[in-house]
């Protein structure tokens, strides 16, 4: 009976861990430090207004996707930005990873809009305008186009 109580307590304690620990996600990569990049971009582009966000590497799938590649996501309700761990490689330029992180951070500050058909639009004109302000925007777009196949099967 005492043993069952201990297991129950462990389950309860586990659910209180921060989200990235619950999911087994890492902040530090082999080549890039996401927290350092987030802090740098937050200061430079957002006046340190993005507070309480966690930035983590997502889970690495065994196989790369066949048709499309998601570089990053933001889960605003939990304030978690996930970056695809396939980007933590030596051949990925730092400025490209900064661009991906900047893109996800923009989602936290530029509001979504509802379209006429009732669907949500996250890449609004305002979002796209602000995204183009990123110093390496054109270079990052070109690099993505030229290197996307490296991330697909």
Regions found by a protein language model. Name each.
Residues 1-99, 108-153:
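Active-site-proximal or metal-binding-adjacent scaffold patches in catalytic folds
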